[in-house]
C-alpha cells in the first residue's frame, strides 16, 4: 500500500510541475524571445533598400527598438523607430506582433509601419534557436512594391544585439544585403 501511495503521490507532483507549462502553448513557443524583451538602441548609417528611405549610407541614424510581452505573454510586440542623427527627424517607424499559429505551430508575424511617407504591411515567420533568430518576411507598400527578405538577429551576451537584413528581393530583383547593425540594451 505504501508503494501505491508513493506512486500516486509522485504522479500528482509531476503532474502539477509539468501542467503549468502545458496550458501555456503560446508562451512555450515564444519564450525564446525572453532575451529580447526590453529597449535597445544603436547608431548606424541609413540602409536604403526600402521604398521611402534615404539611400544607403546617405544619413547617420539612431536606431531604437523595444520588445515587450502582450496579453499575459501570449504574443511579443516589437516597435522600432529610426531617427536621423539629430534625434528628432523620423526616418521610419513600425510594429511587429509575433504570435503562435495554432494550426501550423509556427511563430508568425504581422507588421506595419511607414518608411518615410510610404505605408507598408507585412507578414512572416520566425525561427528561434537559443539567442539566434531568423525572421523570413514579405512586405508590400501602398504603392505596390513587393519585398521579401530575411533578418538574422543574434544576441551577444546580455546587452548586445547584432542584426542584418539579407537575401533581399524587391519586385523579383535581388538587391544587396544591408550592412550589419549593432544595438545595445538601454
Describe each region flagged by the PLM.
Residues 1-4:
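Positively charged n-region of N-terminal signal peptides that target proteins for export
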Residues 7-16:
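Bacterial N-terminal signal peptides
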Residues 20-186:
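Hydrophobic small-molecule pocket/channel-lining residues, especially in calycin-type beta-barrels
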Amino acid at each position: 500500500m505504501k508503494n501505491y501511495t508513493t506512486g500516486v503521490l509522485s504522479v500528482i507532483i509531476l503532474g502539477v510541475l509539468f501542467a503549468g507549462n502545458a496550458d501555456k502553448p503560446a508562451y512555450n513557443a515564444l519564450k525564446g524571445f525572453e532575451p529580447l524583451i526590453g529597449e535597445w538602441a544603436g547608431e548606424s548609417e541609413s540602409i536604403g533598400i526600402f521604398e521611402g528611405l534615404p539611400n544607403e549610407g546617405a544619413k547617420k541614424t539612431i536606431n531604437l527598438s523595444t520588445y515587450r510581452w502582450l496579453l499575459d505573454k501570449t504574443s511579443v510586440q516589437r516597435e522600432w523607430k529610426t531617427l536621423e542623427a539629430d534625434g528628432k527627424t523620423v526616418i521610419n517607424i513600425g510594429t511587429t506582433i509575433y504570435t503562435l499559429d495554432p494550426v501550423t505551430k509556427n511563430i508568425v508575424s504581422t507588421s506595419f509601419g511607414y518608411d518615410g511617407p510610404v505605408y507598408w504591411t507585412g507578414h512572416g515567420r520566425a525561427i528561434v534557436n537559443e539567442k539566434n533568430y531568423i525572421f523570413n518576411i514579405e512586405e508590400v507598400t501602398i504603392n505596390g512594391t513587393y519585398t521579401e527578405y530575411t533578418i538574422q538577429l543574434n544576441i551577444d551576451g546580455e546587452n548586445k544585439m547584432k542584426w542584418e537584413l539579407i537575401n533581399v528581393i524587391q519586385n523579383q530583383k535581388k538587391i544587396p544585403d544591408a550592412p550589419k547593425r549593432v544595438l545595445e540594451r538601454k
